[in-house]
From Swiss-Prot:
Residues 245-272 are annotated as: Disordered. Belongs to the geminiviridae Rep protein family. GO terms for biological process: DNA replication; rolling circle single-stranded viral DNA replication; symbiont-mediated perturbation of host cell cycle G1/S transition checkpoint. Residues 254-264 have a biased composition (Polar residues). InterPro entries: CRESS_DNA_REP, Gemini_AL1_MSV, Gemini_AL1_REP, Gemini_AL1_REP_central. This is Replication-associated protein A. Its cofactor is Mg(2+); Mn(2+). Implicated in enhancement of V-sense gene expression. Acts a an inhibitor of C-sense gene transcription. Pfam families: Gemini_AL1, Gemini_AL1_M. PROSITE patterns: CRESS_DNA_REP (PS52020).
Length: 272
C-alpha cells in the first residue's frame, strides 16, 4: 500500500501557533528568523524556538508563534523549513505551551514580546475573559483540521484525549481510515510489451516446464522397454503426435456447428 492521503482540506486559523519539527537539527535562531518571515503578512509579535533531544539522541525543535492577526493557511507544508515538516497545532493555552517548550531545552531563541493568554491585542482584557477548558468537540475539531496523516491523527488524540483513546481506539481507527484512506498502488505489468517480440519467452518457458506435462524421449524409453535407442523414441513420439493431430482435425471437420440438425427421413409405413 501506498502512503495514506487525506480526503479533506487541511486548515489552520489561530493567532497562537505551536509547531513541532521532529528530527530537526536546525539552529533555533535560524528557524525563528525563517518562520518570522513566513508570517509577516499576519504581523508577528512573538516567537520562541527551543531545540531538545530525544531519548535516542536525535534532535527536535519546538516553536511558539504569536501574531496580531490569526494565521490562516490551508497548506500543511506552509511552515516547512529546509525540508523539515512540522506538526502544526493551535496553542490553546500559550502559557502552558511556553512552559512545555522551556522545560529541558538544549538551545533557545526568542524574538518579540510574549503575550499571555487573552491579552488586549486579541480583543479582550484579562478581566473580561476567564480561561475556559476546551470541550471534546472543540479538541476533535482542531485535531481533524490539523492532522495530515493517520498516524499523526491518532497520536494527537492519544495526547489530547488519553482516556477516550484507550477505551475507544477502534472507533478512532475507523475514523482515521475514513479521513486518510490507503491509496491503492497502480498495477505495473512485470512483462511490458516490446517490439518486435511481444512476449517474454523466458518467463513463458519458466512457467511451461513445471506446469505442462511433456513426454521427453528419455522418459518414453523408460516407459517402453522395447524402445532401445533415442532415435526410436523420437520417431515414435513424432508418429504419435502426427496421428493425434490428424485425429483432432478429423473430429473438428465432422463436428456440426449448425443449429439446424438433419432430421431422419420419414419412411413409408406398410400398405393397408
Amino acid at each position: 500500500m501506498a502512503s495514506s492521503s487525506s480526503n479533506r482540506q487541511f486548515s489552520h486559523r489561530n493567532a497562537n501557533t505551536f509547531l513541532t519539527y521532529p528530527k530537526c537539527p536546525e539552529n533555533p535562531e535560524i528557524a525563528c528568523q525563517m518562520i518570522w518571515e513566513l508570517v509577516v503578512r499576519w504581523i508577528p509579535k512573538y516567537i520562541l524556538c527551543a531545540r531538545e533531544a530525544h531519548k535516542d539522541g536525535s534532535l527536535h525543535l519546538h516553536a511558539l508563534l504569536q501574531t496580531e492577526k490569526p494565521v490562516r493557511i490551508s497548506d500543511s507544508r506552509f511552515f516547512d523549513i529546509n525540508g523539515f515538516h512540522p506538526n502544526i497545532q493551535s496553542a490553546k493555552s500559550v502559557n502552558r505551551v511556553r512552559d512545555y517548550i522551556l522545560k529541558e531545552p538544549l538551545a533557545v531563541f526568542e524574538r518579540g514580546t510574549f503575550i499571555p493568554r487573552k491579552s488586549p491585542f486579541l480583543g479582550k482584557s484579562d478581566s473580561e475573559v476567564k480561561e475556559k477548558k476546551p470541550s471534546k468537540d472543540e479538541i476533535m475539531r482542531d485535531i481533524i483540521s490539523h492532522a495530515t496523516s493517520k498516524a499523526e491523527y491518532l497520536s494527537m488524540i492519544q495526547k489530547e484525549l488519553p482516556f477516550d483513546w484507550s477505551t475507544k481506539l477502534q472507533y478512532f481507527e475507523y475514523s482515521a481510515n475514513k479521513l486518510f484512506p490507503e491509496i491503492q498502488e497502480e498495477f505495473t505489468n512485470p512483462h511490458p510489451p516490446s517490439s518486435p517480440d511481444l512476449l517474454c519467452n523466458e518467463s513463458i518457458n519458466d512457467w511451461l516446464q513445471p506446469n505442462i506435462f511433456q513426454v521427453s524421449p528419455e522418459a518414453y524409453m523408460l516407459l517402453q522397454p522395447t524402445c532401445y535407442t533415442l532415435e526410436d523414441a523420437i520417431s515414435d513420439l513424432q508418429w504419435m503426435d502426427s496421428v493425434s493431430s490428424h485425429q483432432m482435425k478429423d473430429q473438428e471437420s465432422r463436428a456440426s456447428t449448425s443449429s439446424a440438425q438433419q432430421e431422419p427421413e420419414n419412411l413409408l409405413g406398410p400398405e393397408a
